[in-house]
Amino acid sequence: MVHATACSEIIRAEVAELLGVRADALHPGANLVGQGLDSIRMMSLVGRWRRKGIAVDFATLAATPTIEAWSQLVSAGTGVAPTAVAAPGDAGLSQEGEPFPVAPMQHAMWVGRHDHQQLGGVAGHLYVEFDGARVDPDRLRAAATRLALRHPMLRVQFLPDGTQRIPPAAGSRDFPISVADLRHVAPDVVDQRLAGIRDAKSHQQLDGAVFELALTLLPGERTRLHVDLDMQAADAMSYRILLADLAALYDGREPPALGYTYREYRQAIEAEETLPQPVRDADRDWWAQRIPQLPDPPALPTRAGGERDRRRSTRRWHWLDPQTRDALFARARARGITPAMTLAAAFANVLARWSASSRFLLNLPLFSRQALHPDVDLLVGDFTSSLLLDVDLTGARTAAARAQAVQEALRTAAGHSAYPGLSVLRDLSRHRGTQVLAPVVFTSALGLGDLFCPDVTEQFGTPGWIISQGPQVLLDAQVTEFDGGVLVNWDVREGVFAPGVIDAMFTHQVDELLRLAAGDDAWDAPSPSALPAAQRAVRAALNGRTAAPSTEALHDGFFRQAQQQPDAPAVFASSGDLSYAQLRDQASAVAAALRAAGLRVGDTVAVLGPKTGEQVAAVLGILAAGGVYLPIGVDQPRDRAERILATGSVNLALVCGPPCQVRVPVPTLLLADVLAAAPAEFVPGPSDPTALAYVLFTSGSTGEPKGVEVAHDAAMNTVETFIRHFELGAADRWLALATLECDMSVLDIFAALRSGGAIVVVDEAQRRDPDAWARLIDTYEVTALNFMPGWLDMLLEVGGGRLSSLRAVAVGGDWVRPDLARRLQVQAPSARFAGLGGATETAVHATIFEVQDAANLPPDWASVPYGVPFPNNACRVVADSGDDCPDWVAGELWVSGRGIARGYRGRPELTAERFVEHDGRTWYRTGDLARYWHDGTLEFVGRADHRVKISGYRVELGEIEAALQRLPGVHAAAATVLPGGSDVLAAAVCVDDAGVTAESIRQQLADLVPAHMIPRHVTLLDRIPFTDSGKIDRAEVGALLAAEVERSGDRSAPYAAPRTVLQRALRRIVADILGRANDAVGVHDDFFALGGDSVLATQVVAGIRRWLDSPSLMVADMFAARTIAALAQLLTGREANADRLELVAEVYLEIANMTSADVMAALDPIEQPAQPAFKPWVKRFTGTDKPGAVLVFPHAGGAAAAYRWLAKSLVANDVDTFVVQYPQRADRRSHPAADSIEALALELFEAGDWHLTAPLTLFGHCMGAIVAFEFARLAERNGVPVRALWASSGQAPSTVAASGPLPTADRDVLADMVDLGGTDPVLLEDEEFVELLVPAVKADYRALSGYSCPPDVRIRANIHAVGGNRDHRISREMLTSWETHTSGRFTLSHFDGGHFYLNDHLDAVARMVSADVR
């Protein structure tokens, strides 16, 4: 154990070095945070001490940040052995040019940049422009050339298998720098050209390069230096090093020589990873316990669609000057908060205000270079890792509380940082069965020094433009030291976000920082609203709209109309039509009877029975008598109806129609008896608009119905607004479809009669028959509808030409789909269409949005918006914290004003919960989720009670339905979770395009929502079921979907076995890499749901490329395909000869099932043994007993197995085929190589009695064509007939000697094979493969190098030259030279492809050869 006093001095010196101060300036008992130590430096200390074998963790150090406390911790923790690191030795030089592993962050960038990835399609990219003067192009080029030699990572190449290599330096070649000379160009043209350069470079993916410099020469000796870096090659700290070195080299100063390379660093880290890692393992276990509870990333408001580029990034920035920075950090340190966490907390606060939840995952990159060599800090490369913070700001109402919460989250996560954030994300993805991203990033570069050192700005000028972006990153908030202060900037994919969101968020963060810097009180004061003043003003203006109330009760307008126009029609019904006078008389009769039965003012009367025209008189009579009506329809189950009667405190009951079966515990009147009795005199008393008018019972979340009490004045606000908005009058006729229990009936009755119009009653027998509705509209020339969306959908299905009389159609109560407006316009061109929002508690409706141009509604609209509040009403969208949500942020819709209910009958607790006081007024909490648009329009986005948990994600079913309805061909959708305790999403969809399928819907949906929001099951229905009240019947939808899934036997996507050899091979590769049994991986199972991630996907792709000869496969394809079935389809679709893949897969499966000894003994699978007249290494593929055969000669290094597929294609054409095996490979590996081509040909000729198979057709590829030519000469001299020689991609014999020497070194031989295109670079990583390949190729090259043939040497056989039209080695002219070597017929043919065109055209070539044989 280290002595505590000595330890204290050591720690003091290390901390002083990090802070850049004298050791004696640090008091052992002082809080180090207060003296400038931040979390980044603290984490570097942890890493440094752990590598020395000292058992410390970040959380413990952060809890007691003093030298005294740390000395005790360190001295107590020195018993752990330091981590051993393998010495790289001279590997950096001896293996120059060889591939080496990428770092985890490099791999993430490499995978994420592919188009098929979520938030992919972009590179990790940093682009900076320096505006300076007199930068010299030649000096810059010379400096850049030396820079590229100094830092090999500037030459790095990222290979398709997910590794990287640094090719040898290109000798004296200068680093390429493009120079644009605009010194003599007009100013406006200069601006245009500079803008064009910026536009092109700022978001480019560098092709084949990772570092690019360009210089623009400007008038007045000004210059602009454009610096572009692919951050897959170099991290942010490396960028500082690059520019500092470039500036020094430009100035003629040589930086100190480097004795270490990034390649060596990565090799050392990889070696360390292979050793036992007890700290990492413990941290992995710690994270594993928390994976199920980790939150989602921030759910920020995104753009539904539009033309904006969703890949391009924009920047927001603010510079905190030194005074502001010092004040802010001093106040933070006084509270024990580090500067980095102060800035992080301000960012987290913004995320919480604009996100769906105040708890979320935040991604923190860490810059950590392990001190493996003194030069590590001078290297360029990727040294980053990441940390995931579980940030929870719930209840953190002050800046101090938020900062403490974020700092505590950092301490907790950093205490387990040996298991990096990328690994945690992969584990989280496995747990949830879908890819999980952490696309919101906070990058702190505090403590790394100024972004651009003075030398850089002195040489190249001031940075005038900076932008960065990264794959799978939406928003990167960065803080860095700059120009003596702190630069706070965001690089953000603005096209993804809703308009105005990023500006508002960034402004709020800056305001927060300035507020905290300005005074201590701000830290502990309640936080100001996040609602920008401009947005508040828009809402205040809309909420402030008023209209003078009439001060009348609901029925007053009717009685006035009855006096003014007694003979006008009031009701059209199957039970009989009524004029206003007749209806007034019936209403008076009802009122008189109720009074006679003991009704007092304010008493409640239940109205029971089926829907009829007489009910209009019933409710008018109840209200005229001073009563309150409470309807109970015939659809109510008896038990529920009786509970409503009891809860509703009913005093009397009025039964419309026959006596009901419900037990009514109060005096009851039959409406028929009342209307049949002699008229009784009734004199209405004065009405009270503040009195209750009706009680409507709606469903309760507890299963107990709740009765909503609505006063006359509240309902009158809706009635008066409706009449005023649509300018309704005596000429209008209303179709009254809603039952009395439905609040829509309030408008059907009272708005119609108050305006002097007539009601066309849909009675009980007709209310489920949309064709009957259309007949009524047509017959009575109905002009006004007040409908639920489901009703209008059904009506438009059958409307035909019967709806043209409509002029005012209002739809509300559920999602109002835009297609309803479009379809209505076709059938009723004169109709005005409005969507309304509200609830029974808001007196039917509270908001309105009139569609002005139904034919041109935005295609991304999922629903018609709620719109704006009615006059005298006000709305709020409220977060869980109780604060107003900014524009585009979803929250609960609150409604206040004249048009809200009084509460719930007999439920004071529920009333207090849903009707709340705020700012001196009562607000109703609707439970609807809504958001504001920038113009104050409210959009309905779902119901709070429709939120579900899927794979750990919180999912809003309404968002899925909205996305479905945006798809072409889909006009209705409903999503649900299948019953039975599962978290399986399903959706019912109605389509109007026969070409739309369930699978195409799922595929298209992937462009709109994350994978976890794509329903596993999609069922196409003719119609979405609706309740009688016109809302989606979600219970019925769930039952239908569950029945369909049960019927198809596909509830949980059970195991599906492979059906083809290729699928079997793919399953074997995938299962091996996932560590699963073969039968545990079905062909329709999602790779990532089985536990796959980007790293394992890379391994799968490497395996497929290696074993199935599929070099075109990329990691992005795994993310696009996701299942074995889809992957097999993708691979087959890319093959010109699909059978080839099946053959390759068959060979792979044979090998995969062998032992290693079996593999070595059977590297060349033999179709059948040759006849005894031939050597065993002559492979025969029997096709026919007819005379004549094809003899195949492989290419240099090629084994007989490589031509198995050609042989099988020839056999399929009824041709007997032989393939010869050269020595030094496969089963002839121990045979000595031939000294020359002639000797090889002689050995092959003597390998069998070729007279038995004559006449022969010879086929040779590349070198094999030369061997075949010499074989033909031997055959003809020995009387063996040769019909033809097919020379495939081979030089003519007379041209070989003039071609120059062939490579001899192993490295050059391999490079030559790759260049020819016949050897996948991935295979060269396999040492066993290389060990088998190189000796064979070198033996063949030696034989070929000594070959020479005069141009006049000919054979009698015909020669057919064949090649690929894109073969860069064997040109058309070289193939034509074969003509000089035959005295017979010569032909020349080309196929599309390169040197190994044959792989893509096996069948076509086999047919050509076979036709010649026969």
From Swiss-Prot:
Binds 2 phosphopantetheines covalently. GO terms for cellular component: cytoplasm. Signal peptide: none annotated. PANTHER family: NONRIBOSOMAL PEPTIDE SYNTHETASE, PYOCHELIN SYNTHASE PCHF. Belongs to the ATP-dependent AMP-binding enzyme family. MbtB subfamily. Modular protein that contains an aryl carrier protein (ArCP) domain which bears a phosphopantetheinyl arm to attach the activated salicylic acid, a condensation/cyclization domain involved in the formation of the oxazoline ring, an adenylation domain which activates the serine or threonine residue into an aminoacyl-AMP ester, a peptidyl carrier protein (PCP) domain which bears a phosphopantetheinyl arm to attach the activated serine or threonine, and a terminal thioesterase domain which assists in the transfer of intermediates from MbtB to ACP1 in MbtD. This is Phenyloxazoline synthase MbtB. It comes from Mycobacterium tuberculosis (strain CDC 1551 / Oshkosh). The gene is mbtB.
